[in-house]
């Protein structure tokens, strides 16, 4: 069995910079990766301080970019975005601030998605499946129900 080689400060710093070449990371993500690579706790803290001093890592800007990608590309709702950001080790106050500053109308995003998912099928089984799917995506029950009701109304009156 091969034991992990311990990394000193310079090796840990190089490894962290290599990780950051590919994509931005949160502090916690980078810390966890360096721990797994074999860096000592005090070296990890020093590396993180070094990276913060040069603004290579910034949890607030990381959270903004990541939340934007989750909302725009993956069409996640606020609840799922909160969960994903907390998994990345972002502080709850930063998460709340990022979500407050993000300008989006849930109904504008959700209604076309629900319409596509239902595709005119308003049977109870299809609606329940649709609700479960969008709850998983992070939307609230009320938001989903409002979108379904709006689509039903549009279908009835062919708006």
Model-derived segments and their meaning:
Residues 1-159:
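An alpha-helical, amphipathic repeat domain used for nucleic-acid recognition
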């Amino acid at each position: 069995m091969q034991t992990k080689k311990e990394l000193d400060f310079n090796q840990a710093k190089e490894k962290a910079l290599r990780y950051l070449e590919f994509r931005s990371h949160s502090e916690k993500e980078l810390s966890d990766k360096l721990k797994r690579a074999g860096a000592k706790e005090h070296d990890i803290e020093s590396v993180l301080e070094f990276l913060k001093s040069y603004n290579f890592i910034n949890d607030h800007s990381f959270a903004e970019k990541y939340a934007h990608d989750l909302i725009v590309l993956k069409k996640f709702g606020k609840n799922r975005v909160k969960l994903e950001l907390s998994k990345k080790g972002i502080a709850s106050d930063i998460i709340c601030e990022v979500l407050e500053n993000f300008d989006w109308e849930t109904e504008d995003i959700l209604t076309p998605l629900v319409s596509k998912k239902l595709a005119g099928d308003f049977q109870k089984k299809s609606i329940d499946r649709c609700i479960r799917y969008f709850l998983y995506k992070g939307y609230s029950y009320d938001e989903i129900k409002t979108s379904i009701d709006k689509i039903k109304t549009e279908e009835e009156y062919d708006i």
